[in-house]
């Protein structure tokens, strides 16, 4: 029940009453140990527990070098608002630099400043923990062949609010631009045919979301495959979320998000298709969104512009509340998620919509 309470806490855009999850001692191929390393600095030590080498993908994990959600931060029983980015990474053509290689029993350390992705200006005592999944490849390989879960220890830190406030936020505020009221797209951020590409993606996202909502009501076998449940509560939530994405994708000035064709905040790191700032209800496309994926993909579970936009909309609290997280990437990992996590996972919605469109 504590884990369920934790999952209910995921993704809330403002602090709220929450139960801090206890950490079960499940066996994992890796061990993650957190330790305080300064006022708001945390050091994560990742150890390979096994007897064979592992190649660990950094994307959306405790090892991600970008300002992604690496840990959960609580204060007075409430989750502290996350101000960083939630990216969708391209999962094909992975290169070795996206991975961390760990030999048997070897460790690697990764440090990060919580104040760069959380508002800790109030200061005081906070509790920090990490939980997630790491896609794995064979030693020296770049093809994902499995995954391992991790659950860290919990640490308590006493934060000096003034020092935390002096830390520059990793993702600042975007400058206002010319907005197309029809789609809430900042047209001044678009170059060449990018506006046309994005408008097509928005239309396709609306169409796929509407079809997915219908399928959630009429195809219990497919709903079970992706969301691991077919009860009325699950159906209602899935349908509601897809319809919310459909409305946002076809918004006539009533949408709750702002969409940028291009990045002005430095979030388009290698491999990032698009990203969301949930604290600002803001979506940004990256160059490879236009160059490396098609408008629609007719391959089962293939990435495309439409489902990437759909994926990012589920990260926005103005569209989906509580907003979806990145708890598992790709079909194999999504298929392994329990119902409580599947319904809070952004890629579950993108893959389900693709499956209905393609007929997987």
Curated annotation (Swiss-Prot):
GO biological process entries: proteolysis
Gene3D superfamilies: 2.60.40.2970, Collagenase (Catalytic Domain)
Glycosites: 262
Keywords: Cleavage on pair of basic residues, Disulfide bond, Glycoprotein, Hydrolase, Metal-binding, Metalloprotease, Protease, Secreted, Signal, Virulence, Zinc, Zymogen
Cystine pairings recorded for this chain: 190-261, 268-286, 300-360
Molecular function GO labels: metal ion binding; metalloendopeptidase activity
Catalytic activity field: Preferential cleavage of bonds with hydrophobic residues in P1'. Also 3-Asn-|-Gln-4 and 8-Gly-|-Ser-9 bonds in insulin B chain
Listed EC numbers: 3.4.24.39
Prosequence residues removed at maturation: 18-182
Gene Ontology cellular component annotations, sorted alphabetically: extracellular region
Signal sequence bounds: 1-17
Binding site for Zn(2+): 311, 315, 326
CC cofactor: Zn(2+)
Family: Belongs to the peptidase M35 family.
Function comment: Probable secreted metalloprotease that shows high activities on basic nuclear substrates such as histone and protamine. May be involved in virulence.
Name the UniProt record assigns to this protein: Probable neutral protease 2 homolog MCYG_04257
